[in-house]
Every structure is written in C-alpha cells, then in structure tokens.
C-alpha cells in the first residue's frame, strides 16, 4: 500500500452518498488512493477465504467481465475470493477498491502488500479505522456493510453457511441492492434457494443479471457434451461415469476438472459429482 492516506468525515461533500444510506454510517473514512467517484458503478464480489481453485478462477473471470462493461470491483481484500476478484479487475485494467477491517496503514493479510499497492494505483483502499488499528474478528462483519453499500450489486462466489460473505449479501439486500450468487457451495445454494440471490454461473449470466435480463441458455461445450449428458442421469463417482460413457477413467477425470472450472459440475461429499446447470 502507498505510504500516504487521508481522512474524510461523514459531513464532507466528498463522503460517498451511498454510505449515508446505512443505518449506522461510518463517522469518517480513511483512504489511500481515492474514493469511488459519484456515479461510479461498482460490483461487490465476495466469498470464502478458503476458496477452491475453481472458485477463485471464476471470481477472477467474473471480475474481468464486470470491468469489460464499465464496472469496478469492491471487496474486502481477504484471501481467496476477495483477492481473486481484486486481481481480476486489475488484470482487466479496471478500478478496484479494498475495504479493510483494520487500520488504513495495516496490510492484512501481509501477503497482499503488492495487491493493495496495485489497488491504490487503480482505485483505493478504504477503512473506517485509523492508523494503527489492529485486525480484530469483530471488525470484519462491520466492514462488510461498507462493501455492500458502495456497490450496485453484490455477487457471492463461494461461501459456507456461516460466512462473512453472507453478511455482505444480507446487508446488500437490506439496502435494496441486487444480490447474485454462484451455485455450488452451501452458502450460495442457501442464498439462491431462499430467493435472496439470483443464480449466476458464468460471465454471460453475470452480464445478463447486471443488465436486468434473462440470459439465453448456454450451449454445452463440445468437449464436455458426453460428460454433462452422463451427469444428467444423476450424481456419480468418476468410475461410474466412465462406465456410463464408455470412457477411460483418465478421460473422465480430465473432463471433470474442465467441468468444475467452467461451472458445469461440482464435487459432492463422498467423491461424487453432479451437473450444475439445467440447460
């Protein structure tokens, strides 16, 4: 993170108007870099710290897609989904904003020093905590309301049922913002099943959701056609899929890896896999 920072009080003209909608807005903000400009469109992308490789890859792709249609990305700077989303926005040449749950001069986690420095150059680091404030578990759920308020929509990519990302989603819903979620994890499945979130499986569906329209059915990639067809007969272990398809086990394992990364399948407890899309 850059060495300089400044503060803005809640009654200042430059204080983000979106944060004034909060029941308990911050008394002041500390900033390194800049605050989002008036009218700047942001998508919050949040999720698990202990995210899967596939989840992080998808978060990065979704962030790049959002930047491609003129949105910046805001998140909490944590390990896993947050970091992947910030990096995806940076890779696409877009703005990204990190909202800290600690002091403005504290890099947490410390391995994100380069990521935060890049975020300052492309957007900003924001905190309601002044210099020297150490990270504390109780500060991160409070921080999440700022993430939700700054964004026009919140996207949860991967989360457990008891996850800070779900707090962000609930805050977004309370503020009348759109909530989106990638199916395939306990927390996101719960958001979708309860009607809190609109399901989003890939970049195409994200852009349709942001535009407020229904996405056209996605075509199954040719390389995954037989595997997806086999999965539609029911969740199964790789060896059982190989028997269904008349394929070798290495071929099935390679296909499952591709299907997970592209959002067509997910791994279940017990080593089984199931299809994720109805199309």
Language-model regions, residue ranges each:
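Glycine-biased, small-residue-rich flexible motifs in mid-sequence functional cores and linkers
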Residues: 2-279
């Amino acid at each position: 993170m850059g060495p300089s920072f400044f503060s803005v009080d809640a009654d200042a003209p430059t204080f983000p108007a979106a944060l004034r909608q909060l029941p308990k807005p911050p008394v002041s903000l500390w900033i390194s870099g800049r605050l989002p400009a008036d009218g700047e469109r942001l998508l919050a992308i949040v999720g698990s710290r202990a995210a899967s490789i596939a989840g992080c890859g998808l978060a990065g792709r979704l962030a790049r897609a959002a930047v491609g249609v003129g949105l910046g990305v805001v998140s909490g700077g944590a390990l896993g989904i947050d970091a992947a989303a910030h990096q995806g926005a940076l890779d696409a040449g877009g703005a990204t904003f990190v909202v800290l749950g600690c002091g403005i001069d504290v890099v947490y986690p410390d391995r994100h020093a380069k990521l935060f420095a890049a975020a300052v150059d492309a957007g900003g680091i924001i905190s309601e905590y002044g210099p020297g404030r150490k990270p504390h578990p109780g500060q991160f759920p409070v921080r999440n309301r700022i993430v939700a308020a700054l964004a026009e929509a919140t996207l949860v990519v991967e989360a457990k049922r008891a996850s800070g990302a779900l707090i962000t989603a609930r805050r977004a819903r309370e503020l009348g913002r759109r909530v989106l979620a990638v199916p395939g994890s306990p927390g996101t499945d719960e958001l979708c099943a309860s009607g809190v979130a609109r399901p989003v499986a890939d970049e195409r569906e994200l852009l349709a959701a942001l535009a407020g329209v229904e996405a056209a059915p996605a075509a199954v990639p040719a390389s995954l056609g037989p595997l997806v067809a086999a999965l539609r007969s029911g969740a199964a272990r790789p060896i059982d899929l190989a028997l269904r398809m008349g394929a070798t086990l290495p071929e099935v394992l390679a296909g499952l890896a591709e299907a997970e990364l592209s959002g067509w399948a997910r791994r279940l407890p017990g080593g089984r896999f199931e299809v994720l899309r109805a199309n």
